[in-house]
Amino acid sequence: MKRAILGVLRGIASGAKKLVTLPASAISSARNRSMGAKSDAKSTWAVIGLGNPGHKFDGTRHNVGFDVIDAIATIEGIAVTSAKCRALVGVGKVGQCTVVLAKPQTYMNLSGKSVRDIMKTFKIPRDRLLIVYDDLDTPLAELRMKMSGSHGGHNGVRSIIDDATKGMKDFARVKVGIGRPKDSTTPVYEYVLSKFNDEDAAKMIEAVNEAKKSVTEVLMENNLSDAMTRCNSKFAPKKVKAPKRPKI
């Protein structure tokens, strides 16, 4: 498992511009399983990672959502290679749950148009939609899972609320922390489109692995609430005990 995650993120750690690809035999096998997987709206989830298309964005902070989808796809043997709904899409099984994995190929600010098409094509209700994306306000390599909320300044999520969910904010999301730039004069747009240094890349390997596990738990158990509780508890700020008062 760790080897697969390392493969997915090797573009982050080394600055390479190509993400991991499955062997041809594995892609063929996964595609056959995907074609045979029927979409049942009662049990089908759409897990959509946000990012920007094109190799020049591989390994950037803003593409962490894509990295999580690649990690899930690699471990579960789902080929996310079908071009539809303005995205790269793969359909398969995780446990007994049918899942649509997707990476919108619009640019980040237009992600909602692709998400809208995916929801319509695969008949995905909002309570079976899970969005994975980078978050500036979550500390580096930490995770937060939420059942609803505002866009928090993230243009991809803003687009989903505007274009896909008709203003409704009650859809699940996994926020992968990228932190704020250490230099406050660095423009945010430059920061999110930059690549991780080696030290941060090592931390992000673990973060992507944790995000993959959290998403897989949701799908295996068909239960968002329990997975969210476990994830958020793991990354909850540790309480600092007050020093004991000396006895008088």
Regions found by a protein language model. Give the residues of each.
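Nucleotide and nucleotide-moiety/phosphate-recognizing core
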Residues: 2-148, 158-175, 181-187, 208-238, ...
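Short glycine-enriched, charge-decorated loop/helix-capping segments at active-site entrances
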Residues: 144-150, 191-196
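Hydrophobic alpha-helical segments within soluble ligand-binding/sensing domains
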Residues: 153-156
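Short, electropositive alpha-helical surface patch
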Residues: 184-205
